[in-house]
Amino acid sequence: MADGSHSFNFPAPQVSCLRPGEIVVDLFAGGGGASEALKQALGIDPALAYNHDEWAIGMHAANHPLTIHHREDIWHADPRKDVAGRPVGWFHASPDCTHFSQAKGGQPRSHKTRALSWVALKWIGQLLRADLRDGTNTAPRILSLENVWQILTWGPLVAKRCKATGRVMKMDGTVAARGEHVPVANQQLVPDKRHSGRTWRQFVAALESKGYRVEWRKLTASDFGAGTSRERLFLLARRDGQPIVWPAPTHGTAPGMQPRVRAADCLDFSIPCPSIFTRKRPLADATLRRIAKGVMRHVLQSADPFIVPATHQGSDRVN
């Protein structure tokens, strides 16, 4: 509700797809949203969760006290040691999305950040090799990956060029001198449009080479009861011969569907907060355009405008 008490009415798990003894692993675990979804769907907390950030791990630990937490660089984790011979039934990864998001615009990208999805292949490869050597069955049976849908354009990076001179843009914002060699580490890197999606296709092919059937879809959060219209790319992969089953939307305008949840239903407007227009760092042009579009659509041109008026007593109420 508008007092901040809105909650989702997720159905309790009826038949878990996990087999006896299987565990759940959550990479890039933040506040615990994905882990909570997995818990509600599968009926158990993740056994292992990873993040390099102290605050993220702290929040996840508060929300999932039964999970063993590893605060470390995910590239340095030892899956064979941490799994300890237990079969991984579901393996989830939500790698950093900022270097694929359209909100990044023309800003420089990071090779290392964009490569984080490959960690999933590292886990799978190491566990498959251990299984082959030891006669175990620890490698993930089901894999899920969530990211912005622009990850479908994942490909190589190239140096950003000055539009006026055609020369390389350096990380300090200056333009390379004529004939100057700029090391890659000092270049502003942007996606190479000539090879858009090449690395994504290689990633999928690598999963398939490990015996996984792979599918992906772009899903809209508001179709499933969340108070946001954000679109996300979900990849599912499994190597047990079973079909991949996608959920059907539960919210929308079609007959029999639940009404979509508004973001306002999840907010408590009585809590004081600073204005986004008074922040030190100015809003991006794309954000300002979205705000203007929202004001036009939901306030100025709406027959039932959404307004939060301030009363003379200083309190707010939602119309």
Give the label of every model feature segment.
Residues 55-59, 116:
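Conserved short alpha-helix immediately C-terminal to the canonical SAM/SAH-binding motif I
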Residues 72, 92-93, 145:
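Redox-cofactor binding/interface segments in oxidoreductases and associated redox assembly factors
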Residues 80-88, 97-319:
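Class I S-adenosyl-L-methionine
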